[in-house]
Amino acid sequence: MITLKQAMELAPQALSEIKTEIRKKVSESSLNAYVGEIRDSLEGGIPILVKDNINVKGSELTCGSKILEGYVAPYNATVIEKLHAQGMSAFGRSNMDEFAMGSTTESSAHGKTLNPVDSSRVPGGSSGGSASAVAGGLAIAALGSDTGGSIRQPAAFCGCVGLKPTYGRVSRYGLVAYASSLDQIGPITQNVEDAAILFDAISGHDGRDSTSASLAPTQTHKALDANKKQTIAILPDLLKEASKPIQEAYFETVKILESEGHKIVEKSMLNTAYHISAYYVLCTAEASSNLARFDGVRYGRRAEAQNLKELYIKSRTEGFGEEVKRRILLGSFVLSSGYYDAYYLKAQKVRHLIKNQYDEIFKDCDLVLSPVAPTVAPKFGSTSTPLEMYLGDIYTISINLAGLPALSLPVGKSEEGLPVGMQLIGKAFGEQSVLDGALSLERAIGFAL
C-alpha cells in the first residue's frame, strides 16, 4: 500500500482507483479489520480508515457492541471535519474491542480481528482493526483511540507506528467516551512521517471539547529533524516484567540510540503494580458513568419489556458483552459511598504521583524509552483470566494517567518473526521531540512497512 505522504501527491482520479482497490482487498481479506459497509465521507479525498467509536455522519456507529446495532451517526466528529479540511476522507470503519475495553479485539460483536503477521495471534486492542488494516495493506493510514495503550499496543503487535497525542491536543468531540479523562484519538500509520502528517491534520483547539488545549494546530511534519540529538531516559527497573525477546530488543534499541548520538540516562519509577491498580479503578469508574446513557430508550438496541425498569435491565443485559459488564460493575463498586475514599480518591492520588514522577524525569531528559507490551502478540485464547489481559497494559497506562504523548514503532522481530515495538514518551505537548526521536530511530533501524 502506498504511504500517506505519497497519497498526498495523487490526483482525485488516482485516489478513486486506490479506494476501489481497497474495497476489493477488504472483500477478499480474512482479517476482519473493517466492519459494516465501506462509506466514503469525502469524494476525491485520501482514504483514512476510522475506528468504530468515532462519529462519521451517515455511517453506522457500533463501538463493536450489540447495544448500538443500527445506530447511524447524525454528525461528524471534529477529527473528521479536520480530515476533510486537509483533503482526507473517512473511508470505512475499523473493528475494535467493545467500547474500547480490551487488548485483543476479541470482544467485538463483529467477531475477532486477525493479526496480518500471524493469523493465530491477536492484533492487540482496542484499536486492533486499525492496526491490522494498516499492517495488512488494507489501509493507507487509520485513526484509533488510546485510553490505556489502545493505539500503541496494537501498532506494536502488528508492526506499524502508533501515536498517542498529549491529552487535549486532539479534540474528543464525536468520540464515544470510555474514560473521559484518559481517552485520546491518534494516528496509526506505516511510518513515522505519515504519523506526523496525520497528527498535524487532526490536532488543534476545539471549542466544543472543554478539555481541548488552547493551542494552534501543529506543523510537526514540516519541522521533523531526525538529526536532533536528545537526552533519553531508560527505565531498567521496569524490565523485570518483560519477556526475554522484549528485554533483548530494548537494550539493542538503547545501543542504536547511543550510536545515533543521543545521550542515555538511567531513571526509575513507581512499581507498575500501582499503575495498573490506579488505572483500572479510574477507567472503570468513568466507564460506569459514561455507559449509563446506553439504556435502550434514546438510541441503539431496545429490548421488549413490560415496564421501564425491565427495559433498562434487559436492554443492557442483552446489549453489553461480558467484559463491558465486568468493568461497569467494577466502576459502580469503586464509586459507591462505602468505597469511594478507599479506592477512587486513593487512585487519584497515585495518578498525581505518577505525573509528578514523569515531571521529575523530564527536568533533565527529553524523552523516555519504554517497552510497549511485556510480550510479543500472544495467541488467541492464551489469556485465561481478565487479570492476565489487564497486566498486558503495564507499560502503556502510566502515559495516559499522566496525559503525555507517546509513539510506538517497530524496532525488530522476535525469533518467531513477530514484530517487537518500543515507545518513546515525551513531555506534555512535546510531540515534536517524540516524532524527531522516533524518526531518528526508524532511520537507524531501517525498519518500516
From Swiss-Prot:
The keyword GTP-binding does not apply. It comes from Wolinella succinogenes (strain ATCC 29543 / DSM 1740 / CCUG 13145 / JCM 31913 / LMG 7466 / NCTC 11488 / FDC 602W). Pfam families: Amidase. GO terms for cellular component: glutamyl-tRNA(Gln) amidotransferase complex. GO terms for biological process: translation. This is Glutamyl-tRNA(Gln) amidotransferase subunit A. It catalyses: L-glutamyl-tRNA(Gln) + L-glutamine + ATP + H2O = L-glutaminyl-tRNA(Gln) + L-glutamate + ADP + phosphate + H(+). InterPro entries: Amidase (IPR000120), Amidase_CS (IPR020556), Amidase_dom (IPR023631), AS_sf (IPR036928), GatA (IPR004412). Allows the formation of correctly charged Gln-tRNA(Gln) through the transamidation of misacylated Glu-tRNA(Gln) in organisms which lack glutaminyl-tRNA synthetase. The reaction takes place in the presence of glutamine and ATP through an activated gamma-phospho-Glu-tRNA(Gln). PANTHER family: GLUTAMYL-TRNA(GLN) AMIDOTRANSFERASE SUBUNIT A (PTHR11895:SF151), TRANSAMIDASE (PTHR11895). The keyword ATP-binding applies. NCBIfam families: gatA. The active site is at residues 51, 126, 150. Transmembrane segments: none annotated. Belongs to the amidase family. GatA subfamily. Heterotrimer of A, B and C subunits. GO terms for molecular function: ATP binding; glutaminyl-tRNA synthase (glutamine-hydrolyzing) activity. Residues 119-128 have a biased composition (Low complexity). It comes from the Bacteria. Its EC number is 6.3.5.7. Residues 103-128 are annotated as: Disordered.
